[in-house]
Amino acid sequence: MNQKNGNGLNSIKKIISKCCNTDNFDISEQKNDKDVLIFKICSNEVLNIDLDKLCAQDFYICFEKCTIKILRLSEKKIKINLNLFFNSCSFEEIEIYNVYFLGQFKISELVDTLEKIKDIKFNHCAFNNLILEKNKFENNICFEEKTKIKKIYLYENEFKKHFFIKKCFIGSINLWKNEFKNRCYFMDSKFGYDEDENKKAKLNFSNARFQDNVYFNNSHFYDYVDFHECEFEKITCFYGVKFYKTPNFSACYFKEPKAVNLINVDIDKLDFKSVEKYIEDNYKDESYKNETKGMQDKKEFFKIKNKHKLRYAKNLKDSFRVIKDVLITQNNTLEAQEWHKLELYAKEKENHINLSVKDREKNADIFKNILIWFNCVLLNVYRNTSDHHNDFLKILNFTVGMIVLYGVFIFFCQACIEPYSKFFNELKSSVIFIIIGILVFLCWIMFYFNRKKSIFAKSIFFIIAMVFIVLYLVTYFYKTNEYKTIL
């Protein structure tokens, strides 16, 4: 039944009467701020809602200041098209099995005045849009057994008992500003989407406060998950968690760092490219959009763009540092080194962004510019030659390469330079001028190199230039006794 076809209060009342098996309720209609017609139900009785009798309906219904009981344990799967809202209600019992809610399902401003309160359970259910807003739950909240939720939005709730998500599929979750006074479980579940990147899942746990133990055991996070400014006061368990994209733990507070379990956390998917992608995918936030709205000045636009990129790079660096410090507190230096490597990735990207900003500034501090450039090149070289001392194969390849290169230098000296030794001896007086010329040339390359965006190209050129200097010094000192001793 569609409200657009002229559903009146009487027809809606008959539907609700059959659904709740009572006529003792008041019904009214009103429009919300989006001009959508909502039917409000108020009653002093306990309304025992039969969801099977709502399958064919399609309208917005709000139970307000009612006592609700929903018990649906049938093996038969049903779909509910209508939008169900529960405002300022109390729940005697909710246990729902095998129901797919196509519309919105919302519980707000819950009032628990009952002496006996049972758990709120959803098993083998599916939700398109689930909202829990400004509630104080005295019940255990349980989502179990492959319940699928495309969007779950929890805002300013207080959970006095357990909050439980196990073996569920969560597309998007927003846990902003919730207070969990008892244990929380987000176990054996999948957050985000495995393959479909166009869904753009949002996994936001930020600003939540966990006063008791919280467990994320064996869960998979397929998209960016945001834990920034979360407070964890007791045991925090990430055992067996896998992050497919870069997580954000910036400004997280762990009251007991030694109570944080990071055993078997899988971050193999995280590398320098994932750090770059995180910044590119996230810097265009609401603040960025507000600042650049209607802007025509390209220079100012570029400045704001890099300011926000820099902010996200710094936040990411702090995020990796937080986990690194926790692991160091636990004397787990091996795992801490992995997170330190990610921290250096973020630092390199921060320097890169800083460098692009300084390149465009007219009155930039040249000395500071040189330091940023040099740090950026060094981090790039370390990353590509040894992955910041974490990749033995890269270190071995680089070492073997240097030995081979040294052998080539020796061969070059013996085979090519010997016949021209007299000529080189005549150039001894001009050595200092040649070295100065090389340094000036390097400075010119640093400030006017066309491929400013390619730090890797600069690093390669830097290495080649250094090799050139070494070759010249080898040539110059070839005839001295000291060099012959080295050979």
Regions found by a protein language model. Name each.
Residues 1-487:
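Terminal module of membrane-associated proteins
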